[in-house]
Amino acid sequence: MGDEVQLINRLDKSGQSVLLALPMERAQLQEDDMQLRELTCDPKFRRVLITDARNPNAHALAKSLLEAGASAVFVGEAESWRPYPDRAKLESLQGVELVSLDVTDTSSVQELAGEFGGKVDILINNARFVRPGGIQGRGDVGFAMDEMQVNYFGMMRLAQAFAPAMAGRSADGVNSAVAWVNMLSAYSLVSNPGFGSFSASNAAAHSLSQCLRAEMASSGVRVVNVYCGPTEDEWHQPLPPPKVPASTLARELVKALQAGLEDVYVGDIAKDIRRKFMESPKVLEKEMTSLEAL
């Protein structure tokens, strides 16, 4: 009686805001409290699927999730015969298992869902195809089709194959399915003309993620959208800083899961875009257009 507490604001499984009273001083293993876990998507004790091993952020994501207590991390790998820089680093992580997955191939997605669908508690869709360019600078629609195949249709294939099983496992206790994470570009909210076609594919993915969130709402599985600015990779090299390191992206994602957030903006550019988008989408559009003209 009379002890001071701190109030935290969280979302319940229906997406409604609730207040929870916690001790002023953090208790040992506080994050393991069942009531608190019901209000978060904490990766501790849970099994995670990362969809694209070839994305430069895959190793950082897997490492951060394991450090946060994930019991297993499955990492999807397309065309395993084709080498990529971080394969050895991924294989060296205890708790990581590389699995065959190509998000552009419906059969590949369905086969993995049939084998692992009942084991995935958190799905992180980091599959991405990005190339610079808009409309007139490209001679055909080849890259645009690749961007849509991975960034939009890839998410749809994954959702059609994995979402039903995850929705059916949202009340399985410690190992319940809790979160579906979409890694989106901040340019899903406003087009960057220098990456106009990529922006368009992410805008489509953003809209699809909102549809998925609505469909999953009754199950209690949270759809989390991570909006990120330009990252430190080969395709964003021509852009000026600031850029988001993979380690920062991974850290912010884990924090978002632990806090049970629905939307998180990573990096100064993403946060600036969000602020300006909330103030005036048209002014933000004009600003992006003027930057392209410089």
How would you label these PLM feature ranges?
Residues E31-F74:
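Canonical Rossmann dinucleotide-binding motif of NAD(H)/NADP(H)-dependent dehydrogenases/reductases
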Residues I50-T51, N125-R128, G173-S185, V224-N225:
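Structural signature of the Rossmann-like NAD(P)-dependent dehydrogenase/reductase core
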Residues S207, C211-I269:
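SDR active-site lid
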Residues Q110, R128-M145, G168-N175, G194-S197:
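Conserved mid-core segment of classical short-chain dehydrogenase/reductases
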